Amino acid sequence: MAEISRQAYADMFGPTTGDKVRLADTDLWIEVENDLTIYGEEVKFGGGKVIRDGMGQGQMTAQDCVDLVLTNALIVDHWGIVKADIGVKDGRIFAVGKAGNPDIQPGVTIPIGAATEVIAAEGKIVTAGGIDTHIHWICPQQAEEALVSGVTTMIGGGTGPAAGTNATTCTPGPWYIARMLQAADTLPVNIGLLGKGNGSNPDALREQIAAGAIGLKIHEDWGSTPATINCSLSVAEEMDIQVALHSDTLNEAGFVEDTLAAIDGRTIHTFHTEGAGGGHAPDIITACAHPNILPSSTNPTLPYTVNTIDEHLDMLMVCHHLDPDIAEDVAFAESRIRRETIAAEDVLHDIGAFSLTSSDSQAMGRVGEVIIRTWQVAHRMKVQRGALAEESGDNDNFRAKRYVAKYTINPALTHGIAHEVGSVEAGKLADLVVWSPAFFGVKPATIVKGGMIACAPMGDINASIPTPQPVHYRPMFGSLGAARHATRLTFISQAADANRIPQQLNLQSAIAVVKGCRTVKKADMIHNGLQPNITVDAQTYEVRIDGELITSEPADVLPMAQRYFLF
C-alpha cells in the first residue's frame, strides 16, 4: 500500500490513531484511540474525491442506504475518542463505523447511496448534543441560545417571567403543564417539564405527572420540608419519574441530615450541590457522598474565578425576590456564598464526585455557557492538579471523557432519557454537534438535530459563497416548519402517555417517554460515580475528604473566553 506522511493524512482525512488534538485554547490534549475508517478506503466528498457514483457511492435505493453520513469524524464521547464515519437514517444514528460502497469496499457498515447527504467532518470533532437539566423557562429565546452553544435537550420548569419561574424550575399544575407542552412544540430543542413537587398531598403531585411532567422539582422558595421531600419521592417511586431538589438553605425545617433522612435512600437529583445556588448552609455539599444522590452543579460557580464571589450576591437578590434593604434577606443571600465550598467544587468535579453540569438559566446561570464552563473547569483542574491517575499515555483522554459525560450521558441517565439521547451511539436520536478543534466547546461549526442541520454559522446571504462576513448563527431548515416537529422530541411521563396527553393537546412533535428514573444510582454516573468521605467545618467552611483539605485557587485568566467573542 502506498504511504503518505502523517501530516498529509491528517490534512486530508483528519487525525488518525495516535494523533493528538488540542481542545480550543485550553491545556487539554486528546489522542485518537482508534480509527474505524480503514486506511486506503476512506470516503470523502468533493470534486475528484471518493463519494461518487460507482466509487464510494453505491447503487442501492433509499431503503438500503443512510440519509446522512458525517465522514471521518473524531468522536469525543464517554465511551471513547475514536475516528469514524457516522451514519444517520430516519433521524437516528444508524451506525458508527465505516461508510462507503459495500459493492466494492471492505468493512462497510454505513452504506452510501444516491439518497445520502454528506457533512464533511474531516478535521472536526463530533459530540452528542448537550443536555441541560436546570432550565428556568423564563423566556422561549433560551432555546435558541442553548442550541447555538451545542445544547439540544432542555429539562426544567416555568411559565415565563413570573416571580415563581424567575426563582424556581417548576411548571405548576396540569393547566400550565398543558400550555407549556403546547408552547414547547415549536421550540427547536428536545424538552421535558418538571412539575412543582412542593406539596404534601400526593394527588396534587400525581396529577402533574399524569398531565405530562417528567419529574418534580422541590424548591426551598416553595418550602423544601421533609414532608414535601417524602411525598414527592413516594409519588416518584410510584410513577417512575425523577425528583430534583433545591434544599433548605436556612435549615428552617431541619439540617442536611434531616433532608437525607427524609430522602431515605431513594434516588434524587440534587441541584447546585455546592450550595451557592441554594441548599443547606454550609454543608449541602456533603450529600455527594451518598449512593442515591445524583449531584449536579449550575454554571455560575464554574469555574472558580477571582470574580465569582462578587457577582453572586446581586444575582441571588434578583433571582429570589429578595430586598437589599431588609437585613434578613441580605443575611440569607450571604449565607449561600462561601469561598471555601466554591473552591472545592471544581476539585469534586475533577475526581468524579460531582456528576452533572447545568445552567440555571437566567436564574443565576447562563444558558449558553454549560459546555464552555464545563471545559474551563477541566482546563483549570489540569493546570492545578496535573494529569489524572486514570490517564494512560501522554494525553487527557480520561479527563475529556469524564467531563463530556457531565452534560451528555449522565443527565440522560438521571432523567430517564438515555435510551433516546445523550451519546453518539446507534439507535439514538441524531443530535450531533460538529466542532472545529480551535473552537471546541465555544462555537459549534454545525448543530445537527434529529438528523438535519438545525443551526449553523452562516455568512452574507447575498454573497456568492456561504462564508463572507458578517457570519453569525442562523436557524437552518431543520428548525423550520414541520421539519422542526420531525427532528425534536417532547419527553413525557409514562402516565401521560397512557392518558394520551399528546393527542389531547394536538402536539405535533415526536413523543418519547421517560423510564428507569428510580433505579439509577450514583454508581451509574459514568466516569463520575465517586462517593467520597466528605466533611465541612461548620465554622471555617473548609471541605475535606478523608481529612485532606479540598480546595483550588481562583482563576484570573481563562481559556475559551474573550478572544473567541471579539467577532
Swiss-Prot record:
Sites bearing N6-carboxylysine, chain numbering: K217
The keyword Metal-binding belongs to this UniProt entry's keyword annotation: yes
Listed pathway(s): Nitrogen metabolism; urea degradation; CO(2) and NH(3) from urea (urease route): step 1/1
Cofactor(s) essential for the protein: Ni cation
Binding site for substrate: H219
Pfam families hit by this protein: Amidohydro_1, Urease_alpha
GO terms assigned for molecular function: nickel cation binding; urease activity
Subcellular location, record wording: Cytoplasm
Cofactor remark from the record: Binds 2 nickel ions per subunit.
Domain of life: Bacteria
Subunit structure as annotated in this protein's UniProt entry: Heterotrimer of UreA (gamma), UreB (beta) and UreC (alpha) subunits. Three heterotrimers associate to form the active enzyme.
The protein's name in its UniProt record: Urease subunit alpha
Organism: Enterobacter sp. (strain 638)
